[in-house]
């Protein structure tokens, strides 16, 4: 299996093979997932102090915060899958 990566902003990359979902952080359940990830020590903040616009959840239950739109991350994900 070929390892592919997704740029999630500011030079940060995530393994495309490990991504389970890419969601917006606006809803209460996603905010709970973010807080749970923080408590478990599995939260990765890749926003560089900017507003969180996308939450990426991996198969290892890591929660990754990104400051780019979920649609942009998803488009990069789909573009990488086509290669």
Curated annotation (Swiss-Prot):
State the superkingdom: Bacteria
Signal peptide as annotated in the record: none
Q: Name one Pfam family in it.
A: RemA-like
- InterPro entries on file: RemA-like (IPR007169)
Q: Which family does it belong to?
A: Belongs to the RemA family.
HAMAP family according to UniProt: RemA
Quote the protein name from its UniProt record: Putative regulatory protein Tery_2835
* Organism (species): Trichodesmium erythraeum (strain IMS101)
């Amino acid at each position: 299996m070929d390892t592919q990566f997704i740029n999630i902003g500011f030079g940060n990359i995530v393994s495309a093979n490990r991504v389970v979902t890419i969601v917006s952080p606006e809803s209460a359940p996603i905010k709970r997932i973010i807080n749970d990830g923080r408590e478990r020590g599995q939260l990765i903040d890749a926003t560089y102090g900017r507003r969180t616009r996308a939450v990426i959840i991996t198969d290892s239950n890591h929660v990754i915060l990104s400051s780019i739109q979920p649609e942009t991350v998803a488009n990069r994900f789909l573009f990488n899958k086509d290669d």
